[in-house]
Design a protein with these regions (language model features):
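Membrane-embedded helix-loop-helix hairpins and adjacent transmembrane boundary segments
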Residues: 1-518
Length: 518
């Protein structure tokens, strides 16, 4: 191993040891009961709640997927995606957070999202709980796979080891850490990792701009790439066998492609995903007091805006400094790694790599924990064995963690996977399956249990149908699957609710008490 790689490895090992230390510290508290293991006993402060929510939300996608899109095809796709995410983050904290925290307590102290949905409609047969748990298992397993792809790409790029070997190493570390501490450990470490992520993003960007000779020089270096710096146009890399061609050290681009209103709407639709994102919604439920949500929202927005802007600019700066270094869409996602290793001393590059590891851990532990809770708490205790003890539920949850990890590993075996693509599908799945359900559950008293079931099935099903059947038709049908699936889910909720018997007086009275803050 080269001396530089060894120094990077040492820094990353120290970082991982610190993360594991947090897990061990919180393990005893996490094991007390299921509320502490899955929701931290509703004890999160505003800073931890905000930054752990955003760190677990963004994942390695923030440091690899988003910069990779900017490097590969320019500003438009990355900018409009980030704009949608920023707006979605703000609205979610402003509109959903307080009502969801209050309602989750009123709904028999629900500690998971499926449990909240089921209790909201006073279910006896737990159909909503079962369906929502199944969708969570499916989409979070896909989401976890994207994190393992990030680990594999990171370690194989750094150390020249086989992708699969490095992906398995990353999976083992994340699994062990998640087994240790549960939600409290996850949230505490996510807070630390959110700090690491934003620091390394800003540091690498600043150094990259300085090495390029300033922002003006960055833009000068890429201005001749057609559509690269436009908001309503997009660059089109000329490829052969998926590899971008270059002439005399200059990357080849075709004619600028139009980026019209449909494309903008498609990318802005990413913001809709927040309303159905369990790892974010759980932080709303877990904050210790309602009056701390306003401060948490401000913290979250500052972090999100800085991080997204820095991630996009890293992709642009990377193309300006190293225009032909990364020649496929998959390789482009290594631009942050490439910049860090090229511009930073080995020890600082190790810290930057720890930033990617931080992003990956902060997301994958959330995904694994929520998926395991969906099976153990919601399916097993909620449906199959209602008298199961907390100890049984936590034991089963820990058994399910390696099972879910193994399935995610199978999905992540392809080293040519594009992180952005994997994340976008899982994001659409959660947004369309649960987003409309969350909004209508919190703000429409007339919504019925049948409407909730119809909304979940139609939204989740339409994501698959649009992605696999309709989207390949191209043209207007090429829009991001989240938008049509979200709309379809909302329509089904309204129509089916109005066609079925109104909720009982007990359910409606509970809704009014929550609305009034009683």
């Amino acid at each position: 191993m080269e001396q530089g790689s060894l120094q990077i490895l040492i820094v990353m090992v120290v970082y991982m040891a610190a993360v594991i230390g947090i897990g061990i510290f919180f393990a005893r508290r996490a094991n007390a009961d299921t509320e502490k293991f899955f929701l931290g006993g509703r004890s999160l402060g505003p800073w931890v709640s905000a930054m752990s929510a955003e760190a677990s939300d963004m994942s390695g996608w923030l440091l690899m997927g988003l910069p990779g899109v900017a490097y590969w095809c320019g500003l438009a796709d990355a900018f409009w995606t980030a704009a949608g995410l920023a707006v979605g983050t703000y609205i979610n904290w402003l509109v959903v957070s307080k009502r969801l925290r209050r309602y989750s307590i009123a709904a028999n102290n629900a500690i998971t999202l499926p449990e909240f949905f089921s209790n909201r409609f006073h279910e006896k047969k737990k159909v909503i709980m079962g369906i929502s748990a199944a969708f969570i298992l499916v989409f979070f397993t896909v989401y976890a796979a994207s994190c393992l792809v990030t680990c594999g790409k990171l370690f194989s790029t750094l150390f020249g080891a086989p992708y699969i070997t490095m992906m398995l190493v990353g999976a083992a570390f994340v699994l062990i850490y998640t087994l240790l501490g549960g939600f409290l450990a996850e949230s505490a470490s996510d807070f630390m990792q959110a700090i690491v992520m934003v620091v390394v993003l800003v540091a690498v960007l600043t150094l990259g701009v300085a090495n390029a000779g300033g922002l003006a020089a960055v833009f000068e270096n890429v201005k001749d790439f057609p559509g690269f710096l436009e908001f309503f146009g997009i660059a089109d890399p000329v490829t052969e066998g998926g590899v971008q061609l270059a002439v005399n050290g200059v990357p080849s681009f075709g004619a600028r492609q139009d980026y019209g209103a449909l494309s903008v709407a498609s990318m802005l639709a990413w913001g809709l995903g927040y309303f159905g994102m369990p790892q974010v919604l759980l932080r709303f439920m877990a904050i210790r007091r309602e009056d701390e949500l306003k401060r948490a929202r401000r913290v979250a927005m500052v972090w999100v805006v800085i991080s997204l802007a820095a991630a996009i600019m890293i992709g642009i700066v990377g193309r300006a400094l190293f225009p032909t270094a990364l020649t496929t869409a998959s390789e482009a996602e290594n631009v942050f790694i490439y910049l860090s290793r090229s511009l930073l001393p080995a020890a600082l590059a190790g810290l930057a790599m720890a930033g990617i590891l931080a992003a990956t851990i902060s997301s994958s532990d959330s995904y694994l924990l929520i998926a395991a809770s969906a099976f153990a708490k919601n399916a097993y205790q909620g449906i199959f064995k209602k008298n199961a003890t907390d100890k049984e539920v936590m034991t089963l949850s820990r058994i399910m963690l390696p099972v879910i990890t193994a399935i995610a590993i199978v999905i992540a075996l392809d080293e040519n996977s594009v992180i952005f693509t994997i994340v976008s599908f899982a994001w659409a799945g959660f947004g369309a399956t649960f987003g409309p359900l969350v909004l209508f559950s919190l703000f429409w008293k007339r919504m019925t249990r049948a409407g909730a079931i119809a909304g979940m099935l139609s939204g989740g099903g339409m994501v698959f149908i649009w992605k696999l059947v309709i989207k390949p038709l191209g043209g207007i049908f090429g829009i991001y699957e989240l938008l049509p699936a979200f709309i379809v889910s909302g329509i089904f909720i309204i129509v089916v609710s109005l066609l079925t018997i109104a909720p009982s007086k007990e359910i409606q009275d509970e809704f009014e008490r929550v609305k009034k803050g009683a």
